[in-house]
């Protein structure tokens, strides 16, 4: 599954475009975010991407989960959003 990493500085429109492209190509995607600002941008991106794929008859579901990732040798807890068609 393709992993899209989102930061608090990410543009929701850019992430939404990437998300819609991955969904059309692979059928599902995972978004990773660390922190409240990044999660905010990620959720906005899912809402925008839903608007991008809706005209083709696709509705999206989003499954939130925790995941542990390594950053500079340090383990951090991130939120992952698994996005799939309904």
From Swiss-Prot:
Keywords: Cell cycle, Cell division, Septation, Sporulation
Top-level lineage group: Bacteria
GO-annotated molecular function: nucleic acid binding
Gene3D superfamilies the record matches: Alba-like domain (3.30.110.20)
Factors inducing expression: Induced early in sporulation under the control of sigma-H.
Annotated consequence of substituting residue 16 to T: In spoVS11-4; impaired sporulation
Pfam families: SpoVS
Biological process terms in GO annotation: division septum assembly; sporulation resulting in formation of a cellular spore
Transmembrane feature ranges: none
Function comment: Interferes with sporulation at an early stage. Seems to play a positive role in allowing cells to progress beyond stage V of sporulation.
Name of the protein described by the UniProt record: Stage V sporulation protein S
Organism: Bacillus subtilis (strain 168)
Gene that specifies this protein: spoVS
